[in-house]
Design a protein with these regions (language model features):
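Phosphodiester-processing cores and adjacent nucleic acid-binding clamps
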Residues: 1-255
């Protein structure tokens, strides 16, 4: 089971001015229509005032548009995981408590992934020992979904190697498809997660993941074409002429 396809993976940074150096993933799920529109707003700000190589948001912005959204601790490229890798344990607690203040226990969850990686096992263990047991925040069982079908594995890895100049290591992350519940359970046991943190969190996470899937009732209106409305600067006959001007300028800057 996993829920990442139902929301937005944002790039979070505590200080937007340092986002280029501190980008990390943060999963946001639209529980309600208001939450969906708040994700739209976050996405807009991330791509305009928060664009530093990639779209980013910071905690003040997230706090402003948090209603109707469910958030999680996210994967091994999350803020907390990055802090763990840098041995900044106190910062992990501060960030976790910030998220609890913004979302509360009802809308903030601990993600456990079953990847057969040492870094994943360490992260899962810290999440349970330091945060699940102390704060009583429920777990989720999640998979990084990079492609839909398992048969897409080889193509995905080929593209990943191209993007990383051949430095991509496939070990431990060979099943990044949209996995079934049975596959997720098998991945958990294959990675030996139960020996480290206990299988009770696997079954708790499965039930929480199903609960979130039922709670997320936001609906996308795919039948209506909604064109953005914006003011056209003077000197242009209309929006089409202005858009063509922007496209031409953008193309010339890339050539």
């Amino acid at each position: 089971t996993d829920e990442e396809k139902n929301g937005l993976t944002a790039t979070e940074t505590r200080d937007a001015n340092k986002a280029r150096l501190r980008k990390a993933h943060l999963l946001l799920l639209a529980e309600t229509d208001e939450g969906l529109h708040n994700i739209y707003k976050l996405n807009y700000h991330a791509n305009t005032s928060g664009f530093y190589g990639k779209p980013t948001i910071d905690l003040p912005l997230l706090r402003q548009y948090s209603k109707g959204i469910i958030a999680t601790t996210t994967c091994v490229i999350s803020p907390m995981a990055r802090m763990l890798q840098n041995k900044k344990i106190d910062d992990m607690s501060v960030w976790f408590e910030d998220m609890l203040t913004i979302f509360g226990k009802d809308r903030f969850f601990i993600e456990l992934h079953p990847h057969d990686l040492d870094i994943q096992r360490e992260y899962n263990q810290v999440l349970i020992e330091m945060f699940r047991k102390k704060y009583d925040v429920k777990t989720l069982i999640c998979n990084d979904v990079h492609y839909v079908d398992e048969s897409h594995h080889e193509i995905h890895n080929f593209l990943w190697r191209l993007n990383t100049d051949g430095k991509f290591d496939e070990a431990g992350i060979d099943k990044l498809h949209f996995a079934t519940e049975e596959e997720m359970i098998q991945k958990w046991f294959d990675a030996g997660m139960g020996d480290i943190i206990g299988d009770e969190y696997l079954y708790e996470g499965i039930e929480s993941t199903k609960t979130i899937a039922n709670r997320c009732n936001a609906r996308l209106d795919v039948d209506t074409i909604k064109e953005p409305q914006f003011d056209v600067p003077s000197g242009y006959k209309g929006s089409k002429e202005y858009i063509l001007h922007l496209l031409k300028g953008g193309m010339e800057s890339k050539v």
